[in-house]
């Protein structure tokens, strides 16, 4: 039986502002497909990205490049959860499996604003997935990323087994003489880290939200933002922690519910908007319609709710 060549999908997009509204140019190759873009509040280009192959197998590669011009605003999401199929032990020629790889490169110019919000990544048993996210931006630009991964199809009683998930996030601020690091975040989950109390402790869902803010945050702003994020954990299950960056915020979720991770990150997302005087985000049309993560949540820049006592 003839083996199929792995996919290498590429997507390169440029965003420019015209009369207060951001437009995109560029294109992609299979298995990527761009859906119709919406114009959100403040002229933001909201663009869903579709992976038409129905899932990723060992050896597949995805490359995404996003370039934002001055004053442009964009929200990039995916149409559905991304599946990564098992690789380890599936081939006699390659019993150790082959890694599926995804690289995302984001380059932001002055006062631009990018929100990278893909839907959930689901690793099947024995899947190998490695991702890199590289961001460069000036001090007056904003970058927000929220990513959620489920390690094994737990509803079917499946675990990750011999699979592994690797992630490398690097954010650099453009400097007058040389760039400076905002964040370098390298993670690997698999083997003992899945059940170790210093790892996931048996939780199958992990998520990270990172915000590189477009301005230095005062001590009061950081205090209010962190207090609000902790308050937003109320009614949700899992271990949720957050802390400040030099100029921004990082939040982590570990638990059993991708829904609760999505709800918490959506509420923090709304707070980052409010802090900049922007409107509350509209949930992308391709996200689950039955969910309303922002319902009943106050998102004001000067609110100081009581922090949750759990987790």
From Swiss-Prot:
User: Lineage of the native species?
Assistant: Bacteria, Bacillati, Cyanobacteriota, Cyanophyceae, Synechococcales
Localization annotation: Cytoplasm
Q: Which organism is it from?
A: Parasynechococcus marenigrum (strain WH8102)
Write the record's keywords in alphabetical order, separated by commas: Chaperone, Cytoplasm, Nickel insertion
Q: Which Gene Ontology cellular-component terms appear in the entry?
A: cytoplasm
Which Pfam family would be a valid example here? UreD
Q: Which family does it belong to?
A: Belongs to the UreD family.
GO MF terms here are: nickel cation binding
**Keyword Cytoplasm among record annotations:** yes
Q: Has UniProt tagged this entry with the keyword Cytoplasm?
A: yes
Outline the subunit composition.
UreD, UreF and UreG form a complex that acts as a GTP-hydrolysis-dependent molecular chaperone, activating the urease apoprotein by helping to assemble the nickel containing metallocenter of UreC. The UreE protein probably delivers the nickel.
Report the protein's function.
Required for maturation of urease via the functional incorporation of the urease nickel metallocenter.
Q: What is this protein called?
A: Urease accessory protein UreD
